[in-house]
Amino acid sequence: HHLKQVPVAVERREPVEVVSGDRDLFQVVRSEPTPVQVVYVGRGLAKAETIGPAELANRYGLPEAGAGPGYADLAALRGDPSDGLPGVPGIGEKTAATLISRFGSMEGLLAALDDPQSALAAGIRAKLRAARDYLELAPSVVRVATDAPVRKDRDDTLPAEPADPAALTALQQKWGLGTAVDRLVAALAAHR
């Protein structure tokens, strides 16, 4: 599993929004059994984007069904220098997306590589063959864990007001938080 990330537990009952500036988490995007979207803040909060299966498919040329897992396979093929993944030499993002779209997954692509009758072009086949060891290992590094246990032992709804207004006021004054805390309290009250 992806070594850089804290494992992401995808709740199985309610829609999930993952807020992150790391595109690696695009792989958890899905429609079913429960919707999962990534609120991508990699270019700052003011430019936050909500990425669901349709947006992921449009951005990277992947099929909408399975766009999340397809993104992980695309990343393994094209490489990701920030994660130390070299990718397959000569396979860029567009070719990777085409291969994942055509063969469905890394597993499907490797099966096509092993099948001399498959529709793989000779040049692509040679590049993939040369990187076979990498292709068998990369998915286990790229994929994030989605099965971490999630304890729901507290109410996760936003409070309508601070639990201890006096303590909050003391912290606000001590740290000079002024209007930031006032805006937070107003936002909580408005969210009721």
Residue ranges and their predicted role:
Residues 1-151:
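Extended two-metal-dependent nuclease catalytic cores across DNA- and RNA-processing enzymes
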Residues 130, 140-192:
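Low-complexity, acidic/Ser/Thr- and charged residue-rich accessory regions of DNA metabolism proteins
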